[in-house]
Structure formats: structure tokens, C-alpha cells
């Protein structure tokens, strides 16, 4: 499995011959992403939905998201669109995706996604700390966690989430575009609490394999 951070909350996950793009924000570079098979959108806010219509049309990709995203995509003229709800599981090629609840009060239907292929990746979208994340404990190899604060978890809340879920690898996101949060502070917070997890502090369009 290969995971590439494309900035903000946007990731490209490639596994078992399937390419999934998550939350393509308005400034993402579609040329550097290339062709994808599916686009997962966690919620309707434009810093997550952003370039979904453009990239979907360029790639002939299917767009998957909660009700608000489904309606937005249809209104944008897309035809390969699927709605997903909390607790629902779907198959994307040889990859299984399950939608789960996230704590983002300014969104109508906020979701996170557990992506299960050769490894298990959880994308939290925009969220604060939530006790509901106990369902993910021990089930996540790579956690994509927001640290930006304001409308998402702060550095300290992100550490709370990591402590609860206990992934092997944590990748900070949702900073550097609309937030001045520092991933180094996230690392320090984890170290201070003696939460031993590998933190991948990526540059935009940098990736790794697991």
C-alpha cells in the first residue's frame, strides 16, 4: 500500500491496483495526482470537496460521500456518484471501505473512512476528539489525523485521538493551508505523554509505502 499526502486533508491511497483520492481541496494539483479510480469525500465543506468535480471528470472516477456530498456532486453534473452512511461498508475493487462517525458540528453528515486493503488506514476528515473512536482501537495501521485546531482537533486533541486509537503510524494533516499548526508540536505532545507511535511528517505530494 502506498499513501501520498497531497496537502491539507487530501491523500492518495494506492493498493491492489486501485487508486483512491480523499478530500481534494481547491488548491490541490490534479496534474500531480494523475488518474484515480475513486474519490472519497468526508463532508461537504469546500476545503474537502474542492476539486472533486474536476478530478472526477478528468479520471472518470466515482465519487463517494455522505448525503450532502452526493447532492453537491449531482448538482455539479457528475453521474458516477454514490452515497454512503455511518456504519456502511462498500467494496472498491479489492479494497473495503467503512464509513464511521466523526465529531464535526458544522457539517451535516461528517464521516471518516476506514480503508482496508493490504493494510488498514483511517482518515478522520474534520473532527474533534470523540469517544466513538474507541471502535477503531487496535484496527488501524495508519491514522490520518487533523491537528489544525479551530474547526478540527488541536495538537493536544490529536494526541488524545492517537492515544485512544493506538495506530502504528500517525500522519498529521489539516495544517499548512488554513492553519499554522506545527507537526513538530504534535510529535512533542506525543513524546511528552510517552505515546510511542511513528509519526510521518510528510511534505506535500510526499508518500510512503507500508
Swiss-Prot record:
Pfam families: Lactamase_B_3. Keywords: Hydrolase. One of its GO terms (molecular function) is hydrolase activity. InterPro entries: Metallo-B-lactamas, RibonucZ/Hydroxyglut_hydro, UPF0173_UPF0282_UlaG_hydrolase. PANTHER family: METALLO-BETA-LACTAMASE DOMAIN-CONTAINING PROTEIN (PTHR43546:SF8), UPF0173 METAL-DEPENDENT HYDROLASE MJ1163-RELATED (PTHR43546). Belongs to the UPF0173 family. This is UPF0173 protein PF0020. It comes from Pyrococcus furiosus (strain ATCC 43587 / DSM 3638 / JCM 8422 / Vc1).
Amino acid at each position: 500500500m502506498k499513501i501520498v499526502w497531497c496537502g491539507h486533508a487530501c491523500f492518495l491511497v494506492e493498493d491492489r491496483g486501485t487508486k483512491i483520492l480523499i478530500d481534494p481541496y481547491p488548491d490541490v494539483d490534479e496534474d500531480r495526482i494523475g488518474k484515480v479510480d475513486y474519490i472519497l469525500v468526508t463532508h461537504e465543506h469546500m476545503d474537502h470537496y474542492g476539486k472533486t468535480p474536476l478530478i472526477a471528470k478528468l479520471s472518470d472516477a466515482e465519487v463517494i460521500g455522505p448525503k450532502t456530498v452526493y447532492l453537491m456532486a449531482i448538482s455539479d453534473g457528475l453521474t458516477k456518484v454514490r452515497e454512503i452512511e455511518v456504519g456502511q461498508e462498500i467494496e472498491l475493487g479489492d479494497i473495503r471501505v467503512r464509513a464511521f462517525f466523526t465529531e464535526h458540528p458544522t457539517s451535516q453528515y461528517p464521516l471518516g473512512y476506514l480503508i482496508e486493503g493490504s493494510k488498514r488506514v483511517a482518515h478522520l476528515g474534520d473532527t474533534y476528539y470523540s469517544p466513538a473512536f474507541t471502535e477503531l482501537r487496535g484496527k488501524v495501521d495508519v491514522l490520518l489525523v487533523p491537528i489544525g485546531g479551530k474547526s478540527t482537533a488541536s495538537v493536544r486533541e490529536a494526541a488524545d485521538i492517537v492515544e485512544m486509537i493506538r495506530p502504528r503510524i500517525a500522519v498529521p494533516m489539516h495544517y499548512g493551508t488554513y492553519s499554522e499548526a506545527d507537526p513538530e508540536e504534535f510529535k512533542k505532545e506525543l513524546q511528552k505523554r510517552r505515546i510511542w507511535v511513528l509519526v510521518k511528517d510528510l511534505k506535500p505530494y510526499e508518500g510512503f509505502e507500508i
